[in-house]
Amino acid sequence: MNSILKEIINDKLMWVKYHKKKQPLFTFQNKIVRSNYNFKNSLKSIHPSYILEIKKASPSLGIINNKLDLKKISLIYKKYASSISILTDEKYFHGNFEFIPIVRKIAHRQPILCKDFFIDPYQIYLARYYQADAILLMLSILNDNQYVFLRNIAEMLNMDVLTEIENKKELTRAINLKSKIIGINNRNLNNLSIDIQKTKVLAPLIPKKIIIISESGIQNYNQIRQLKPFVQGFLIGSNLMRKKNLEEAVCKMILGNNKICGLTQSSDVKIIKEYGIVYGGLIFCKFSPRYINCNNAYSIINNVSLKYIGVFCNENLKRVAYIGTKLSLHAVQLHGNEDQIYINNLKLILPKHIKIWKSIIYLDFLKNQKHLFYNVNKYIIDNKDGGSGKTFNWKYLKNCKLDNVILAGGLDINNCILATDLGCYGYDFNSKLESSPGIKDLKKIVALTYSLRRHTVFNYRNLICLGKK
């Protein structure tokens, strides 16, 4: 055990000793009832499952979320999480057991995992008293006898146990101890570094009947796509807690950076927001059947907080800047023959917060990867007939750097999962999600988000009910 962990455990021993006197077990033990939530089943019900975590601070990052709004976080997490994890350690994570009932009052459906440094039965009784449904037991701080003793108490209270391991030795112990849920911590507890490849190395060694969770260091949807074949779910905390827009961060993590373009009516804007799409595209090219003028655009996006992208084609610079400013666009997307001079001049007159995206034919992208435009934040890669709703052969992008590329052209429910295998920054959907030009089809949008969430194609024709999970 390293010095940091030793310090934490010594402090935890003192915490337990103090709280046993402050809040003796006999004062609340007869008020404890067995949990009626099933943490294990929540992880099995959908693949991948997500344990979304509430965490104010950590030893490695310090303060992560200074204004921890438990009610706001709970309202968001209850839409997307399979289970909710709450850090209750006070000194190092600025947590509290009293966080649990606040979250439980709002998130009625999700089991709650209490994450702490469990070393004493008292902590387990306390966790259940405050309505936790599962606990984390770390093999890095417990010997086998201690682990079994604590697990038996948890199971007596009908609480599940997430057994955390950090290395192969601990994994062997977890298997021998017949752990039902194993969490692979991608963090090195000696130096606090992160390596998500650890999940790929250790997961294949675990029997299939055991549920595997990947913990720590998960940054984005592409990483989840890579790790999903190895695990049942993910525990994600720090990367979400540090974001100003939590719901957007959750949607990006679970569904990816997706844009639905060609929006022409407010009902569609509200729908794509509700189902976790991050970017909404507004087309200001007059030749497009999905053309919308500035005033109409303003009225349909009013009070719906998406990141809006304005699409322009060889438009007057001042008009692009005017519309971008009036609508507070996230980015302007140039879809014509705009050259470097045009882009430079546009950059000078655009508000600093508005990004520039440039559509480019995939053949041109392949030829000029090292000599693309300056002052462009993202590239929309399309086929040679951009905007036609047709795909191109994606194998040409296989060895390209795609972290600033948004794939477009004929994307739909049937090919979206194959597209996400490429690892692009994001994906641009339009005509294939419509019932007619500019009119989006609700069932297709729901089926798309189902598919992206589960990483498998979902047939919208079989859609019976709507929902986010």
From Swiss-Prot:
A GO BP entry: L-tryptophan biosynthetic process
A Pfam family assignment: IGPS
Chain residue ranges for the region called Indole-3-glycerol phosphate synthase: 1-257
Entry keyword Lyase: yes
Enzyme Commission number, as recorded: 4.1.1.48, 5.3.1.24
Residue segments, region N-(5'-phosphoribosyl)anthranilate isomerase: 258-469
CDD domains, sorted: IGPS (cd00331), PRAI (cd00405)
Assembly notes: Monomer.
Protein name: Tryptophan biosynthesis protein TrpCF
Organism of origin: Buchnera aphidicola subsp. Baizongia pistaciae (strain Bp)
